[in-house]
């Protein structure tokens, strides 16, 4: 079944460094790939490829568990999470574990449990990976036809797609269950400065949920990244989980239609390129979400967003100068615009100065001071609470702008501290990874299309310098 075509013709891109070197019995002569091409040697060995994937999952889960325990071991409850370079504990805290009112950590034991569970799981995955890579059957088709596949088998491929979609849907519903029944999640908008609460009144209205998808990505619109209440987030997961599970069942039960059979390339490398493209999109969306959204990524754990730190600075100095007798409603700044307050293009009262560009920021410490027409002057004069002053001063000095030498905050700010915000780390890393995944998508898509069209011959190797060199062994 697997030898319907010559591997040579199907995988013609070769580089002969040392054709005789054989790793685990899979040499260049039999697979068409040299040792350094890694899992490409396993393209038609479903059992060994399974081992590679399970082992990879084990490495991922091991990192999660080990890094989790590392963060727990270094965690200081007296300092905010974002000052300690943590990237995993904020996620656990956001899910409502170990935190109380205001995002204060009251118990680190759940974090320890999470780390240990991941470590134990990684051992199981690691064993399975090594077993399937070294001892298990090379191919699954003969002994376990349910788990076997041929890359060209369109029906089997969409069945596998369906199984993956169902698993993703179950994952979405796990968050829903946590929010509804298992202790709730952290809500930065809870009255009095954030708390863990169960979500009771889900947003299931399709016009609201899918309205986010139809919004513009710019300015105050912000596409799905603009979501700012947990009811919408959890309701969105109900919709997404349902769509994934129903779509998964659909793909398991049906065969691809003729237009889909014609439109797609049906080979292992093509599926790799589709997956890389999807992961790339995930990375770019995650980048924007963690950078701009302070509901899904509460500022109590991740530090303020860029716009939030900027608005916090304007607010802090408004409070200071108002105490010193300034009339913040009418004071004029160096540009002739309002020094503390001005109007937005649509007429709302907003903070003046350089932070005007961030006038559409929404944050739990600022919203109580807004009225129907933007910031309410009488509330700014009479209603500012001490917790709002404390929080804005804290956020002002923790802007997510880390320079290379890790001086956090605004470069000219004398109160800045030595730190880089986890928002900076998470946004930058996901952007960079998303970009590289996109390049990988283009690369493998190009190769897969060329191979399907039958003209991928690779570089002409007749005059390669390496051919005149002595073999490595």
Curated annotation (Swiss-Prot):
GO molecular function: chlorophyll binding; electron transporter, transferring electrons within the cyclic electron transport pathway of photosynthesis activity; metal ion binding
Gene Ontology BP annotations: photosynthetic electron transport in photosystem II
Protein's cellular compartments: Plastid, Chloroplast thylakoid membrane
Keyword Chloroplast (UniProt): yes
Propeptide residue intervals: 1-14
Sorted UniProt keywords: Acetylation, Chlorophyll, Chloroplast, Chromophore, Manganese, Membrane, Metal-binding, Phosphoprotein, Photosynthesis, Photosystem II, Plastid, Thylakoid, Transmembrane, Transmembrane helix
Highest rank taxon of the organism: Eukaryota
Segments passing through the bilayer: 69-93, 134-155, 178-200, 255-275, 291-312, 447-471
List of residues binding [CaMn4O5] cluster: 367
Membrane topology: Multi-pass membrane protein
Entry note: cofactor: Binds multiple chlorophylls and provides some of the ligands for the Ca-4Mn-5O cluster of the oxygen-evolving complex. It may also provide a ligand for a Cl- that is required for oxygen evolution. PSII binds additional chlorophylls, carotenoids and specific lipids.
Modified residues (N-acetylthreonine): 15
Sites bearing Phosphothreonine, chain numbering: 15
InterPro entries, per database record: PS_antenna-like (IPR000932), PS_II_antenna-like_sf (IPR036001), PSII_PsbC (IPR005869), PSII_PsbC_sf (IPR044900)
UniProt family annotation: Belongs to the PsbB/PsbC family. PsbC subfamily.
Assembly with partners or alone: PSII is composed of 1 copy each of membrane proteins PsbA, PsbB, PsbC, PsbD, PsbE, PsbF, PsbH, PsbI, PsbJ, PsbK, PsbL, PsbM, PsbT, PsbX, PsbY, PsbZ, Psb30/Ycf12, at least 3 peripheral proteins of the oxygen-evolving complex and a large number of cofactors. It forms dimeric complexes.
Function: One of the components of the core complex of photosystem II (PSII). It binds chlorophyll and helps catalyze the primary light-induced photochemical processes of PSII. PSII is a light-driven water:plastoquinone oxidoreductase, using light energy to abstract electrons from H(2)O, generating O(2) and a proton gradient subsequently used for ATP formation.
HAMAP family: PSII_PsbC_CP43
Protein name, per record: Photosystem II CP43 reaction center protein
Lineage summary: Eukaryota, Viridiplantae, Streptophyta, Embryophyta, Tracheophyta
Gene name as annotated: psbC
């Amino acid at each position: 079944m697997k030898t319907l075509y010559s591997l040579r013709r199907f995988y013609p891109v070769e580089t002969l460094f040392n054709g005789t070197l054989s790793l685990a019995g899979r040499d260049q002569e039999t697979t068409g790939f040299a040792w350094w091409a890694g899992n490409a040697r396993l393209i038609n060995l479903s059992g060994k490829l399974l081992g590679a994937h399970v082992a990879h999952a084990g490495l991922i889960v091991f990192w999660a568990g080990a890094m989790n325990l590392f963060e727990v071991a270094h965690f200081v409850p007296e300092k905010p999470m974002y000052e300690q370079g943590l990237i995993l504990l904020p996620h656990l805290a956001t899910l409502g574990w170990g935190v109380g009112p205001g995002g204060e950590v009251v118990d680190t034991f759940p974090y320890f449990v999470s780390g240990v569970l991941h470590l134990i799981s990684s051992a199981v995955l690691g064993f399975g990976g090594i077993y399937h890579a070294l001892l298990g059957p090379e191919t699954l088709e003969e002994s376990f036809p349910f788990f076997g596949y041929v890359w060209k088998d369109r029906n089997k491929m969409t069945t596998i797609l369906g199984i993956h979609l169902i698993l993703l849907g179950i994952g979405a519903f796990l968050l829903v269950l946590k929010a509804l029944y298992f202790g709730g999640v952290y809500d930065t908008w809870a009255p009095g400065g954030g708390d863990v609460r169960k979500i009771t009144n889900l947003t299931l209205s399709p016009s609201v949920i899918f309205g986010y998808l139809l919004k513009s990505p710019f300015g105050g619109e912000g596409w799905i990244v603009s979501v700012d209440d947990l009811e919408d987030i959890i309701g969105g997961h109900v919709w997404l989980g349902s769509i994934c599970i129903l779509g998964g069942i659909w793909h398991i039960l049906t065969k691809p239609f003729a237009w889909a059979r014609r439109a797609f390339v049906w080979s292992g490398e093509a599926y790799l390129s589709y997956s890389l493209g999807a992961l790339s999109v995930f990375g770019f969306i995650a980048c924007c979400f963690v950078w701009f959204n302070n509901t899904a990524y509460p500022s109590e754990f991740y530090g303020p967003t860029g716009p939030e730190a900027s608005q916090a600075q304007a607010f802090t100095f408004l409070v200071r100068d108002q105490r010193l007798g300034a009339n913040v409603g009418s004071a004029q700044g160096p540009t002739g615009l309002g020094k503390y307050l001005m109007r937005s293009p649509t007429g709302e009262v907003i903070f003046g100065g350089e932070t005007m560009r961030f006038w559409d920021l929404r944050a739990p410490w600022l919203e109580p001071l807004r009225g129907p027409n933007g910031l309410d002057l009488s509330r700014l004069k009479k209603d500012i609470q001490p917790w709002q002053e404390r929080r804005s001063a804290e956020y002002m000095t923790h802007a997510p702008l880390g320079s290379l030498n890790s001086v956090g905050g605004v470069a000219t700010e004398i109160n800045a501290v030595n730190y880089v915000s986890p928002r900076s780390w998470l946004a930058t890393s996901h952007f960079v990874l998303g970009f590289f995944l996109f390049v990988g998508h283009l690369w493998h898509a190009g190769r897969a299309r060329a191979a399907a069209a039958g003209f991928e011959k690779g570089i002409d190797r007749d005059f390669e310098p390496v051919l005149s060199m002595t073999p490595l062994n």
